Amino acid sequence: MILVAIVTYNGLKWIDSLLQPFLYDLDQLEIAVVDNASTDGTPDEIKKRYPFVRVLRRPSNLGFGAANNLLMEEVQAKECYEGIFLLNQDASISAETIRALADYSQQHPEIGILSPLHLSSDGAIEQGFAHYLPESPYHGFTELSFINAALWYLPRQTLLKVGLFSPLFHHYGEDLDYAHRVRFAGLKIGFLPHLTGQHFRPSTPISDEKTLRLKQAYHLAEAINPLLSPFAQFYRGHLAPFGEALLSRGNRRWPLLKMARNLWQMRPMMKLWRQRPPLDLEGLQRALDRKELPPLLLFVYNRPKHTERILQNLLQQPEITNTPIYIWSDGAKSADDQQAVEEVRALCRQFPKAQLHCQPTNRGLAHNIVEGVTNLLQTHDRVIVLEDDLILSPYFLRWMNDALSLYASEKRIAHLHAGTFYTSPKLRNNHPLYFAGSWGWATWQDRWQELWEPDGKQLLQQLERDPKLYQRFRYGGFMDFPKMLRRQIAGENNSWAIRWHASLLLHQKLSVNSNPPLVSNDGFDGSGTHSGGGGRYHTAVAPYPLYADPIAPTSEDPEAYHILRRYYARTNNKVMKGWYKLKELWQRYFS
């Protein structure tokens, strides 16, 4: 079976030329469309005219690569597929040609990407395809360094060996990066000249904006090109665009400088991408087989920009269409906050299928979290919790769902956390700690009902009776959590997290934490109610899937504890606190 993958976005005018070739010929083929939130009725018309097509409707535009990844993962996970054919919405090809490409590829396992000859609507070789061709004539398989992804056949073995499109690219450049990786894996890219497909790409002039986006995509692909040395990656990905910007004149300079800055700021994400782990096929299969997903509870207040961003992050999650969403909106403290609160609520009402709970008065974050989590866990056996100032990896829900499922019966684990701000190369994924991080977390009904203790004074007294646990709660004196708990008792803060942390430590219950982080906290920009800090906790989030370890941990990871303790020692001193305060002021007034 070959999966024909099509990504549509407002492609109504193309659907007949796209799908009619399969109307009476589906032999060995399955046709699937991922629709990127079209507004012209594309998915409805496809279902009406071509009912044999499987349509996956997305609530937002994922971009070309991420949308194709949804179907590419299916081919990775299921042995019934021998490969996948990526078909642009503005392209057309016969079912017979797709089967011929698959047959040839099966006979030549050294091929990673195989394509037909791309023709335009007038029968000539399509201009973009012709750009990469050697001089004719072409006889048999013709190897190239790159072919655009309008008409790609990828054997399943290519997907298992090379992986998916990189989420670093939203639109443009993802096929160039994938071609680099295919060649790095020792596979060939090429086309068969006796097989043809049509690509109806219009030959209109390219706008300055698109030219800039293409240029940035090219430099990004070069910055992570595994075929290049580290110096060549740095030169082509960063120095070259910066130099071009400096040498340019007039109106071109500032857009090019902005492009160079964007590429520079992506370095932490590029580093994570280079360090991505091999495919966890069992984890992927678990994810695709999982039908019932736990609810997600999001807390918001008066920051429309933060709320809009996290809602967009959620829409990028592959699992979001099957995830129950509950949003808890706090009431305004004063008339000055009322407009911002209403703007936030208006954004939340637009989120597909979300249930919005609006507090009539301002209750504060701690009260809302305790009330919201407690109420939701009366009807659900687990919950994922987020706040509005978090930045999410597109695979945040993937890891959370996996860990909640695998560790449900391991009572020594009471908490999951994806905001690993103390990240380190020595830190393993799924490391267990007696530490309850609150930036992207989850728990189970039985753990919350058994362990949540609202009385901070009682928790402190129990800790003081056990000197070993008390010192552990201080992290060697580098993070004075007992002081924070005393302030909560005195009413100087209303932290729920410090009480949850203390309770888990007293009961020797573990938290399992992701690494790399899947959540970053951006609430230390001076916009929040409780926190400043100049971005000390900001981290890049994993641009690839992580999965839980099927063997549940039963004791704390001592290396992870020492890494966390050293992190507090390094960042929680007077010099660093002063530095972070200066950064916070700079961000607040000059960014």
Label for each model-derived stretch:
Residues 58-78, 360-375:
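Glycine-rich, basic loop-to-helix element that forms the pyrophosphate-binding segment
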Residues 35-44, 60, 91, 329-344:
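A conserved acidic beta->alpha catalytic loop
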Residues 212-217, 227-288, 574-584, 588:
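Non-catalytic, C-terminal membrane-associated alpha-helical segments of glycosyltransferases
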Residues 80-92, 380-391:
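Short beta-strand-to-loop acidic/aromatic patch adjacent to the donor-nucleotide binding site
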Residues 10-24, 303-318:
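Short, well-formed alpha-helical segments that are part of the catalytic scaffolds
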Residues 160-191, 195-198, 207-213, 454-467, ...:
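Donor nucleotide-sugar recognition loop
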Residues 194-197, 206-237, 259-268, 532-548:
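Catalytic core of nucleotide-sugar-dependent glycosyltransferases
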